[in-house]
Amino acid sequence: MDFSSTVASQLYTGAILPESIVILTLIVVLVGDLIVGRARSGWIPYAAIAGLLGSVFALYLGWDNPHPVAFLGAFNSDNLSILFRGIIVLSTAFTIMMSVRYVERSGTALSEFICILLTATLGGMFLSGANELVMIFVSLEMLSISSYLLTGYMKRDPRSNEAALKYLLIGAASSAIFLYGVSLLYGLSGGKTILSEIALGFTDPQGGQSLALAIALVFAIAGIAFKISAVPFHQWTPDVYEGSPTPVVAFLSVGSKAAGFALAIRLLVTVFNPVSEEWHFIFTALAILSMVLGNVVALAQTSMKRMLAYSSIAQAGFVMIGLVAGTDAGYSSVIFYLLVYLFMNLGAFTCVILFSLRTGTDQIAEYAGLYQKDPLLTLGLSVCLLSLGGIPPLAGFFGKIYLFWAGWQAGLYGLVLLGLITSVISIYYYIRVIKMMVVKEPQEMSDSVRNYPAVTWTAVGMKPLQVGLVLSVIITSLAGILSNPLFVIADQSVTSTPMLQVANHPTEQVVAQVDSELVGVAIADH
């Protein structure tokens, strides 16, 4: 076996074909913009979306890959990571659709915005499949630093600068906390960095090792909770969401959150299985706090972006029910809910962007009477908000049903009942917006709606917004009806991922996982 084939067998670069396509797209956008100039850069968003769709197709081709482990065990392209990476890529594609008009109108460069967004996408994709401590941290920082830049991209807007500074300071602290937890794992394992190898040394922790592992768990969860906006690590979310460019907020609410949950599942199930009772308890507390605080505080909000920020916190609490369940049904429901949450949440943000572009405000009171001036926008926002509230037969209803049923089967009766109660609370503030939009009396119409410009889709960048809105509404409506096939796909990704069976057969499963993840090395040796 020659040198090139040895390297190829050890690295198995085919596992990162989707990421390679995104990297190529990033280079094309960057170099193309330098060559043709900003004045003729109208093709850039469409090239970026085409590249992202190509990445989705590459993910489809990688489904049921018999050799998912690459880079000497550092990256795992199993079906679980494929679905999470797909959610992140699709969220980026929709974000670009809603960004074209928004960024152009702000007077900033669209190509640079898309390049930073694609870099954040790469960080999220690598984080979803990262199986090694260094790669986890590098991917996390790649996603985080790009997110800081995106948050402060509107340099002329003081609110954007303030949001970026807050996000940077709190994010840097959370990264340091997470890194300390990771360093404890490195030391406890005797210098191991592959997750499954670390887990092999913790199959029966004793005394001080068990205590140190619990301490590492607390620090690791603190870093993860920041990424998914779980209470009490949520303080940055409302301010950052309100001050950041709305397309960036949309990406953070879905893409960044999906990457955080992917990391949580892989890290907790693989490494922290010996202290599973502890991390289940912690995430139960986080879920309770997130559902209660997120939904209750959202009732008092006057800004749509702040309301959706607290809604995002509450939605993370609902998703954590599936994580705490710790069963195949629980993990499947997490994936399914994030998949439908992608469309209903980004659809809602698309409507917020359209309204703000036409009126210059995002205050909830200014939506009064919108139905009389823009029925399509009213319909789209209503469908997405009702789905977020869990109203049947929309996608959000079935997503919550799967989460609550998985929690009920796992014996989490109190957590499920609290989820049901807080879901009812959430319906109130969603319905409040819808009721305001459909008022019929002219005197109840807000000043912004009374002076609402004529609805037109001919301006530059409006067509992608229209396409994104229509797609979001259609998928949100149909995903509820077609929930069973989608849930079957989510379930297949879970049942075909060996690491998720570690809890049932710790020693045997971990050993088997180590063997499978080092297959590249074994092939190279032969």
UniProtKB/Swiss-Prot annotation:
Enzyme class, UniProt record, top EC level: translocase
One GO term describing the cellular component:
plasma membrane-derived thylakoid membrane
Q: Where in the cell is it found?
A: Cellular thylakoid membrane
Predominant cellular place of this UniProt entry's protein: membrane
Q: Which residues cross the membrane?
A: 16-36, 43-63, 80-100, 107-127, 133-153, 168-188, 211-231, 245-265, 279-299, 307-327, 335-355, 379-399, 401-421, 469-489
Reactions catalysed, as given in the entry: a plastoquinone + NADH + (n+1) H(+)(in) = a plastoquinol + NAD(+) + n H(+)(out); a plastoquinone + NADPH + (n+1) H(+)(in) = a plastoquinol + NADP(+) + n H(+)(out)
What's an example GO BP annotation here?
photosynthesis, light reaction
Print the keywords alphabetically.
Membrane, NAD, NADP, Plastoquinone, Quinone, Thylakoid, Translocase, Transmembrane, Transmembrane helix, Transport
What protein name applies here? NAD(P)H-quinone oxidoreductase subunit 2
